[in-house]
Every structure is written in C-alpha cells, then in structure tokens.
UniProtKB/Swiss-Prot annotation:
Induction: Expression is largely up-regulated in the presence of benzoate. This is p-hydroxybenzoate-m-hydroxylase. It catalyses: 4-hydroxybenzoate + NADH + O2 + H(+) = 3,4-dihydroxybenzoate + NAD(+) + H2O; 4-hydroxybenzoate + NADPH + O2 + H(+) = 3,4-dihydroxybenzoate + NADP(+) + H2O. Binds 1 FAD per subunit. The chain crosses the membrane at residues 12-33. GO terms for molecular function: FAD binding; oxidoreductase activity; oxidoreductase activity, acting on paired donors, with incorporation or reduction of molecular oxygen, NAD(P)H as one donor, and incorporation of one atom of oxygen. It is found in: Membrane. It is an enzyme of class 1 (oxidoreductase). It comes from the Eukaryota. Disulfide bonds: none annotated. It comes from Emericella nidulans (strain FGSC A4 / ATCC 38163 / CBS 112.46 / NRRL 194 / M139). Signal peptide: none annotated. The keyword Oxidoreductase applies.
C-alpha cells in the first residue's frame, strides 16, 4: 500500500531516534525547519544502552535548556575513577589508585560524568521535540532513497515504510540524515565501507541491576583487573549499577565473535573477579551481549545531501563512555551548518566541513580508545604518578612522564573539552593568511577550534551573576563577545566598532532581520539579526559603567552587557578575571567570535577605526552568500 502521488516536502528527513537523531531533530525543529523524523522501534528505549554524559555534553545540554530536566532524574555523578588489580599474594583484588575523572586542569563547571540511562535522556529530548512541532513517527523504517535532482529545492526522494501497516510513503527532502546506528541502511545503500582501525575486537556482557555487596567502590566508576578477568563498574540512578564484563577477545586462541553468555554466567564471572568481596543481585533490569570492534566510516556523505552521524559512522569500546557524547557533537555540528546554509548566511560548500571536522574527531576517539585500553591493562601507574597527573596544570613541562601526558590528554579528550577542530574556513588560527593584522590577540589563552572557556560575570540588566558561556542559548547564531576593557580607554574603539556595524555591508547589517521593524522590545538575543548575537563585557565594577555612553546599536543588546567583576579561583590574582583568564589586556580588551556550537572561531584585537569590524567582515565574508565590507550607511 502506498500513499498518494504528490509527495510531501521536508527540509530534512531524519532516520533514527537515538542520541544523534534526537539532538539534530530538536535543533532543526526549534530553528524553524520542517522535519520528518522516524524510528524503527515501536517505543523509545526502555532500559540499557548508553548512559554516560561527559562534562562538555552537559554544557551543551544546558545550552539547549535540557540539563535541569535530566538532572531531575537524580542521576549518579562520577567524580572519581578507581583502579583495582590482583593482590600479590593471589588473595583477590586491591585498590591500586584512584583519581578525578575530570582533573582540575580541565576548566569546567561540571567536573563529573552524569549517569542516567538513555531512555530517560531520550524522553527529555522527545518532549522538547514535540513542543517544537515535530513528532517521531514509529515504527517506521527507510526502504529507499535517491538524490535524483528532479526537484532542485528538494532533490532527495525518500521511501519510508510503516512496520505495523506496511504503508509506504514517498517524500521529498532537502536533506536525509541517517542516525540509524551501526547497521545503517543508508550507509549500506551508499556503498560506504566501515574501516576497522583495530583488528582486535571484543565481546562484552553488559548488565544493569540492583546489587548487594561489600565492595567499597560500588558507587564509583571502577576498572577492575583480576586473575579471573576484567570488569568495569558504572554507578547508575535508582541504586542501580552497570557492569561491563569482557567475555571474549580476538586475542583469545578460541575467539568467537558470536560468543554469548547468560546473565547468570556473567554474574558468576563477576563474583570471581570481585573476590574477596561478595556481590549478589536483587534484580537485573537489563542485560545484553554484544561484540565491539573499532571502526570508522570511510565517508560521512557522498553528495552533501545525504549525511550520516553517530554509530552509523564510528564504533568503539564502552571504556571511555564516548558513544552518546560523540553523537551529540555530530548532531550539533550538522545542525548549525545546515542552518547556516538554509538561512542564507553560508555558501553550500561549507557543508563539507561536517565530514572533515567530525571524522577527524572520530579518528582521534578511536586512537584514544586504544590508548585507554593499553593504559589500564598493560601498565600500572604508581601512587606518585597518579597524584601528579590529577593535580598537574596543562602545559607544565615539555618533558612530562608518558603516563602523566597520556592521562591528561585522555581526560581532556574524554571530557569533551579536548575536542579541537583543525583550521578551516570556520576556524582561523595564527596560520590563516588573513589580510588584517588585527586577527589573533597577543597573549590570548583561547585556542581556535576548542570550546569557549567558562567565565562568570555580572549582567547589568538585573545584577545577576551569570555564566558567560551560557548566556546565549543554542539558537544557531554566531556569538560575538566584545571584551571592552576599561570603558575610559576603549570608548572611542567601541564607538568606532558600533559605527562600522551600522554600515550597510557589515556582517550584522547585511543579514538583518526582515521583521526588524516589528521586533519585540523584549527580544533578548537577536534584536538585529537571527544569525548573530553580541555581548559586551567591561573591565569595570558594575556601578562604574556608564550605560549612556554605550552606542545605541550595542545598547539594543541590553541583556548582554556585563561587568567583569566576579573573582575566579583559576586566576586568583586577577582584578578582572574574565578578561585575564581568557588572555585579554583589561586596558585594551579584544573580540572573540564563537561558532553556534560554542567553539572558538577567531579572535580579533579591539582597535580604534574600522579595523575590528573590517576583520569580522573578512571572517564572515569568507563563507557568506553576500559581499561584506562596503561603505554605505545602514538603517539599523
């Protein structure tokens, strides 16, 4: 049975409602796009699957307005990781080390891993997706697609089938996105191969349940090696614990990738591994056995109309807890770039950066996955190294101990804050051949391609202490943070900056809102353009800032004018902590552009004259659909 011959048209069809699909669906739905979202499961995830939210992902969830709802489930929070190994006398296991899962050298407000099962996370997303006007249709699957170009605006034809009724629906879309998981129909139809980086594969038994035990670290993340085997312990919400038990490895003489084990067999293995401690199960909520091989898709897209993300592109072991987190980052990267193109800001060619950025991160993830396994199974750190690594500051010594360096790099990467996109059209580092000498602020502590550093400031509109990196929600807009330094020193530079923003072909004027005449007085983030939000931060005490001397175009962002007057323990001697932590001279200031995903795009010196806005025009003009930088006056 098929539907009528006039196919409905969508901006995007999303297949799969796992982590990558739901975050992409939420962003696209909230940002005004028509989304067709299907999943082949009759109901959302009830138990099991991914459960670890890393610190940077928590930051993203807060930026999406979801963190509070997820925390309402009272999830377990892992601040510490313990390592257990065999006792020398063979009498069982002993703790050989423990350290923070997110050490102090990582600047985050969330120095912990949040653990709650995927079904609850999905529920939060699905509720918000529905509020934004999209419903995930179940149980539907994809049975065919082609980019036939018969409709220039909606070039992708997609065939979908309801698994309950066998109804087949044909739709047209601008884009098709596969978030189907490791067994992706879309990837298979495109003929894209998974390249296995590591020939070693594993079979794991995974069990969620409520246990009784005298093992002292049951509420802590643990990696346990014993003469009877290896286990990973992950605390969960509602008094549950997740146990990962390695059942088989391809290094075993009789390795069978289809090897299985019953829940009772895995429990018996766990009991042997944990000796001299006992463990008993009150109940088992979920149990599964699955093979793990490290693989990465050779391509994420062939035509920049049909894309893939999440497990459809990369698979790895559960040790580092990265699957869902990497999927979230894939989705956000995809979402803001599609929005940049479809909103008319960016040329279509920028979509190629989705694959180059995210595939590079997946490659790095698999490399770290290998290091993680080697680090904890082949070499035991001594107590001195553990303490040194956990307290070390970044960049301390060029001759760091290999273990300390690997530990730091691993923690930073797995936290999400080690993700660094390489230089490209969006990420301008000092190697970029930009003509303006104002790019790159001397002494800046921000790294292009990495997430914006947290800082706390006072919002002048209501005197609230706020987290600057969270002040602009994930709305698809670029963020321009103007660190204005001392007001008396920067007054002319700010006046010139504002005057040049007013020009007709400034980035702000060229993409001003079509409804700017009707815009609400209460519009917080986008009074001029839906594609940019400006923030102004002065190195002054709150009551010393003269609002009347701030140009009107910047005063329009009245909810985004701040005083840098809150101390920061990371720069205890700083008078103006946000400026100084980020590396700005409090007298001179500077400008930071972050992408809609909060990664650093570029930094620019704040100078008198047109130079600062000229530099920003050059940056945005490198990918914009309109010429930027002409000299006519604007009506903003």
């Amino acid at each position: 049975m098929t539907t009528d011959s006039y196919p409905k048209k969508y901006d995007i069809v999303i297949v799969g409602a796992g982590p990558v699909g739901i975050l992409l669906s939420l962003c696209m739905s909230r940002w005004g796009y028509k989304v067709k979202h299907i999943d082949n499961r009759p109901v959302p995830t009830a138990t099991g699957r991914a459960d670890g939210i890393q610190p940077r992902s928590t930051e993203i969830l807060r930026n999406l307005g979801l963190k509070r709802k997820i925390m309402a489930y009272d999830p377990a929070k892992v601040y510490d990781v313990s390592f257990w190994d065999p006792r020398p006398d063979g009498s069982g296991i002993m703790r050989t080390g423990n350290w923070p899962s997110c050490p102090r050298f990582i600047d985050t407000r969330y120095p912990f891993t949040t653990l709650v099962h995927q079904g609850k996370i999905e529920t939060v997303f699905l509720d918000e997706i529905k509020k934004a006007g999209t419903t995930v249709e179940r149980p539907w699957t994809i049975i065919g697609f082609k980019n036939d170009g018969l409709d220039a605006t909606y070039p992708v034809q997609v065939q979908l089938k309801c698994l309950d009724t066998n109804v087949v629906e044909t739709v047209r879309a601008k884009y098709l996105f596969s978030g189907e998981g490791a067994r992706s129909f879309v990837r298979e139809q495109l003929g894209i191969q998974i390249r296995h980086k590591d020939p070693i594969s594993y079979v794991w038994g995974v069990m969620d349940g409520v246990v009784r035990t005298d093992f002292p670290d049951i509420q802590t993340k643990c990696t346990i090696h014993s003469d009877a085997g290896s286990i990973m312990v992950i605390p969960r919400e509602d008094d549950m614990v997740r146990l990962y038990v390695q059942i088989a490895s391809s290094s075993d003489p009789d390795f069978n990738p289809r090897k299985t084990a019953t829940a009772e067999e895995v429990q018996n293995v766990a009991k042997k591994i944990l000796k001299p401690y006992y463990i008993e199960w009150d109940r088992v909520e979920w149990y599964s056995v699955y093979p793990i091989g490290q693989g990465i898709s050779e391509k994420y897209t062939l035509d920049e109309r049909v894309f893939m993300g999440g497990d459809a592109c990369h698979t790895h072991s559960p040790k580092a807890g990265q699957g869902m987190n990497t999927a979230f980052h894939d989705a956000l990267n995809m979402a803001w770039k599609l929005h940049a193109v479809e909103s008319g800001l960016a040329q279509r060619s920028i979509l190629s950066t989705y694959e180059t950025e995210r595939k590079n991160i997946a490659e790095t993830l698999l490399d770290f996955d290998n290091k993680y396994a080697a680090l904890f199974s082949k070499r035991r750190p001594n107590a001195g190294e553990v303490g040194e690594a956990a307290t070390a500051e970044t960049g301390r010594s060029a001759e760091e101990d290999p273990f300390v360096k690997t530990f730091k790099d691993s923690c930073e990467f797995t936290s999400g804050y080690g993700v660094a996109y390489l230089p490209n059209i969006f990420n301008w580092d000092p190697s970029h051949p930009a003509k303006s000498p104002l790019f790159d602020v001397p002494g800046i502590n921000l790294v292009t391609g990495k997430a914006f550093t947290p800082s706390t400031v006072t919002r002048l509109a209501d005197s609230n202490f706020v987290h600057l990196e969270q002040e602009i929600p994930a709305n698809g807009a670029f963020r321009i943070f103007i660190f204005a330094g001392r007001q008396s020193r920067s007054k002319k530079a700010i006046a010139d900056f504002a005057a040049n923003l007013e020009k007709e072909r400034s980035f702000l004027s060229a993409y001003r809102r079509s409804d700017i005449g009707e815009i609400s007085f209460f519009e917080r983030h986008n009074p001029h353009s839906k594609l940019f939000t400006l923030c102004l931060i002065y190195a002054e005490k709150k009551n010393d800032i003269d609002m009347d001397s701030i140009p009107q175009i910047l005063r329009d962002y009245r909810y985004h004018i701040y005083s840098d007057d809150i101390p920061d323990v990371r720069v205890p001697n700083a008078t103006y902590a946000a400026h100084e932590k980020l590396g700005f001279d409090p007298e001179k200031g500077g400008v930071v552009v972050t992408r809609p995903d909060s990664h650093i795009a570029c930094t620019v010196q704040l100078a008198e004259g047109s130079g600062t806005v000229d530099a920003l025009n050059a940056y945005f003009g490198s990918f914009s659909t309109k010429p930027l930088g002409q000299e006519q006056a604007s009506r903003l």
